[in-house]
A protein has these predicted regions:
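Ser/Thr/Pro-rich low-complexity tracts
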Residues: 1-316
Length: 316
């Protein structure tokens, strides 16, 4: 004679349930259950049941539990030889920390304190920036029950979503960053520039600027001075006309157009010159010339000592 004891589940409460709370499973022949398996293979063995009888199991929901099906097993998952019967219970909702709506941090700057209000924020283990960096945070709950987490926006924060993460690893968005960048930047002077000139760049949130990259140069230079409204930087000799880039620690850059001085030819002093002789050129900004290229490809390097006149040797 053989017989079976039909294991059955009648109710599972509470649902939704918060990690750390006690889940009560009621049914028949639950005394045969050796393991309660939460979604994605997260088992709790009968030794860890809070209560266990024919009609009821009480089990603490693991902090790592996620929303999904719960499975009851009449043998342990550690028993590789056992032929397990599995009873699936669909639709357990595991509570996550939540906010009513993600904050808009568009106007925020590195160093600003960010306060996030929400529910079940005590579950938060990690606050992560858009670039993947984890930041320290403080959790608080007021006497009226208001929950908050507070953190400081780091220097290298980038645009994107800030998320909070509980033990389950599920990421929940709490804020979106559109970093407060320097905008409407004006360069003074913006034209007629030469190496060694001091350029004043005026705008908003200029204290965010860490370096300046000039057109024609790979290596960035540091500002000579900066404040919330302006940055002062010395024009390198090798810089050319184009867009200089104001760089921030977050990796973002803002372009500003500049124009350098150009040498201007006006006249030759001597109309006829013999090979190997000297020729004198008159013009403007001639001290900017470093090399003269003749028809045919011959080159002569020069060291001007005047802005209006340049004497060079004709090639032989």
């Amino acid at each position: 004679i053989t017989y079976t004891e039909p294991i059955g589940v009648e109710t599972i409460t509470p649902n939704p349930v918060k990690p750390g709370e006690v889940l009560v499973i009621k049914g028949e022949y639950l005394n045969l259950i050796k393991e309660v398996i939460f979604f994605e293979e997260l088992p709790v063995g009968e030794d860890d049941f809070i209560a266990h009888s024919r009609k009821e199991i009480q089990v603490k929901v693991p902090m790592e539990a996620r929303t999904g099906d719960v499975t009851l097993a009449d043998a342990s998952s550690e028993d590789s030889d056992a032929l397990r019967n599995l009873i699936h219970v669909k639709g357990l909702v595991v509570i996550l920390p939540s906010v009513e709506a993600p904050l808009d941090l568009t106007a925020k700057k590195p160093g600003d304190e960010i306060v996030v209000k929400g529910k079940d924020l005590d579950l938060v283990n990690i606050v992560k920036m858009p670039n993947g960096e984890e930041v320290e945070f403080d959790y608080a709950k007021s006497g009226e029950g208001e929950e908050t987490i507070t953190f400081i926006l780091p220097e290298n924060a980038t645009n994107g979503a800030v998320v909070m993460i509980p033990a389950s690893g599920v990421e929940v968005g709490i804020a979106n960053i559109g970093m407060a960048l320097h905008e409407k930047v004006v360069a003074t002077p913006a034209s007629g520039l030469r190496g060694g000139d001091m350029i004043t760049l005026t705008g908003i949130n200029m204290e965010l600027v860490t370096t300046v990259t000039f057109p024609g140069m790979e290596e960035a230079v540091e500002p000579a001075a900066k404040s919330a409204t302006e940055v002062e930087v010395v024009m390198p000799v090798a810089a050319i006309s184009g867009e200089l880039l104001l760089n921030t620690a977050s990796g973002t850059s803002v372009p500003v157009a500049i124009t350098t001085l150009k040498p201007e030819f006006m006249a030759f002093v001597n109309d006829a010159v013999s090979l190997g002789g000297d020729v004198t050129i008159q013009g403007k900004n001639l001290d900017l010339i470093a090399k003269v290229v003749y028809t045919g490809g011959a080159e002569v390097e020069v060291t001007p000592n005047s802005t209006t006149e340049l004497t060079i040797a004709m090639p032989t």
